[in-house]
Amino acid sequence: DIRTENIAVFTDEKWLGFILSQIIQNALKYFDKPKKVLSLYSEENDTSASLVIRDNGCGISASDLPRIFEKGFTGSDRTKNASTGMGLYLAKTLCDRLGLGLAVESREGEFTKVTVIFPKGTVHEMEETSVL
């Protein structure tokens, strides 16, 4: 499910592509329902534009949610899937370097919603340097 809007953002295309790839790969990896739903849509307010990726996968437990951006953290129930704990860590690190926000809302067994936030009035680019 993809809803489109005419919202332009200025950021580093390569790194944004990498961030979105990590988020979408995570969503696809943790689908656990027969009917899989992955939605992408934008939102806008006075201070920012956002890209939202929402799935109906297994969700993230409330106890794991505060740790999902930690390097190497794979969650308490991730033994079924090969995980390194690097995907969301890298996505968050890159968002921070680009001046973007990254927010996650989830309910275990129901959904995960990841929002990439682009503050208005700034250009978000990153020089070629190490992100780790």
Residues covered by each model-derived region:
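Acidic ATP/Mg2+-coordinating residue in the GHKL
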Residues: 55
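Conserved micro-motifs of the catalytic ATP-binding
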Residues: 4, 8-11
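Short conserved segment of the HATPase_c
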Residues: 60-72, 130-131
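Short helix-loop "hinge" at the ATP-lid/N-box region of the Bergerat-fold HATPase_c
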Residues: 27-28
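Short beta-strand/loop element within the Bergerat-fold HATPase_c
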Residues: 37-47
